[in-house]
Amino acid sequence: MALGVAAASLFATSSASSHGYTDSPISRQKLCANGTVKNCGDIQWEPQSVEGLKGFPAAGPADGRICAGGNSRFSQLDDPRGGAWPTTKVTAGQSYTFRWQFTARHATTDFRYYITKNGWTGTKALTRADLDTQPFLVVPYNNQQPPSTLSHSGTIPAGKSGKAVILAVWTIADTGNAFYACSDVQF
């Protein structure tokens, strides 16, 4: 799979106080925060706090704990819920605008986007074996701080079908951590 590198489109809005999550496609943590998904535990109040070790896929959260960034407080994000997470409709091979919302901005190494392999059913917690471990989109950020809203345009890989998860990883430059967001999609 070819590695995409994108230029970032910036849209600034006001800032609050914590970290960040994706809302396009909508992430599991945002679905919990806006009340679409119930029984989410602490993540419903802290969608911006899914922070774990950086270095994915060689390091970072353990298999089965990826969507929660390895953070046990947010383990509901790793719960497959029988494959019933709401999905965003996407088209394989088409351009898509991925969007992050930040409540605290950090010096950033890059943003990386991964997707599950065809045949993934969503009935078990996400593992590296479920993912194409080569990101389909990488957006270098050269130690800059993003604005409070940031969009990246990239192409969703061709040949994808069925259900999938897009894993977005925001790698922080000046700490050992990254932020993780899982978005359930349907082709």
Tell where the protein language model's regions lie, with residue ranges.
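Internal, hydrophobic beta-strand segments that form the core of beta-sheet-rich folds
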Residues: R112, T116, K160-T175
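Secretory targeting and sorting signals
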Residues: M1-S18
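A short, structured loop/turn motif at beta-sheet edges
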Residues: A104, N118-W120, P157-G162, F187
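N-terminal "mature-chain" segments and other terminal, solvent-exposed stretches
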Residues: A16-R128
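Extracellular carbohydrate recognition and processing domains
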Residues: L126-T155
